[in-house]
Amino acid sequence: MPFCKDFLWGGATAANQIEGGWQEGGKGPSEADMLSAGTHTTPRQITPDTEPGLTYPNRTASDFYHHYKKDIALMGEMGFKAYRMSIAWSRIFPTGEETEPNPAGLQFYDDVFDELKAHGIEPIVTLSHYEMPLHLVNKYNGWASREVIALFERYARTVIAHFKGKVRYYLTFNEINCGTLPLGNYMSLGIRNEGTRDFLHQVDDVQVRYQALHHQLVASACTVLAGHELDPEAKIGNMIAMMPVYPLTCNPKDMLEFQQNWRQFNWYCADVQCRGAYPYYAQSFWEKNGIHLEITNEDRETLRRGTVDFFSLSYYQTNCVTVDPNAAQASGNLLGGAKNPYLESSQWGWQVDPDGLRYTLNEIESRYDLPIIIVENGLGARDALEADGSIHDPYRIDYLQRHIRAMKQAVEEDGVDLFGYTTWGCIDLVSASTGEMAKRYGFIYVDCDDQGHGSFKRYKKDSFDWYRKVIETNGEEL
């Protein structure tokens, strides 16, 4: 059967990558405000304070804070049914420890949600998308402290209660499974171990990281329970960065490597959030890595009861794994792996694999039997603004066409229960991995360079009209 008639077509962004206004409306600094600009080859720097000579792109980003009415009008012109966005925690609780929320922060999002409603667009709200209040990073080393669970629950309860009737869909933590990687220390968990500066090569303490991830999983379950209590109409989902892998060869040892890699990155957090308990393989992983988690009986009961209502995911690429140390490697700037000889790569070295999306959706469906929504998918590429204001991006249209076609096959031929699709970076924004504006994903071009200079004027790319037609025909015309 085709996509359901109320399928949620739209786009996605994150507050720290699009909003700007980092010191306006009572907002406090977040962890993202201390990330410098980088490039494909130069890692971003994590600084304890503002340092001369460095650019901090998330502070201005795409200036959605001052352009939201225009931006939402453009989404409406494309026919968006949904807009997946995040609320900046430090705009609601500037340090994370206030007992009362910042009224100006709540008002800003009230205005955004009212504008979305005026254009018939459903908000899908991520409560935490790599933007922990900086104060909590400095005082508690982020999620390493159990104290942060209660602070996050207060924030989540405030948001869900205040926006009752305006927001029906929430995601707890963006790409929570990035906490299974050393890369996730700062970005996902707010951990800044001593000596950490290079964003891509952080000082790692696996014990601290997995304890912090446990605290985050408990907070996610607390949020689900609070959401159901405060707003019975609300649906609370998880958000997993799906990074499928294939065994490079039919060597049984490659198959075992594939199995272990897949479940530890893709399933470890999802099993807890969807099934309510740690999976059987977690204990052996902890023992092999000298991890001794503090898990209380109350934690176990919270996890058991606080399972999510739906499964959301990001999907960009796949990799291969092998036990062969001499295998050629993919050149991805964020997560690498063995090079797949059957796949092409993006300008940033990410291996493009539409069929992998179909495979992934089927794996999720068969494992969890929950409604699924894709909340991130897209192609980061360099775009050229022509003298006449046009931007020709056939490469983006091609990428999205192929992924939507694979998504359709998963629904129509395989029976996957998919209820929405929001492309990543529908409006150009700051790249999380590199801090660049040059790595553009949007249907809407923002006139801003990597140093934050430009008019911030918005221009429609060729893909703008193409996606409008896709939505208008409910995915029939690609």
What are the roles of these predicted feature ranges?
Residues M1-I46, E51-P52, G76, T95-E97, ...:
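Active-site region of glycoside hydrolase catalytic domains
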Residues I87-P101:
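Glycine-rich, proline-tolerant flexible connector loops at the mouths of alpha/beta enzymes
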Residues N58, Y65, G96-T99, Q347:
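Short, flexible active-site loop motifs that bind/organize anionic cofactors or intermediates
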Residues G53-H66, A144-R146:
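Active-site mouth loops of central-metabolism enzymes
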Residues D63, H67-A88, R305-F310:
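Catalytic domains of carbohydrate-active enzymes, especially glycoside hydrolases
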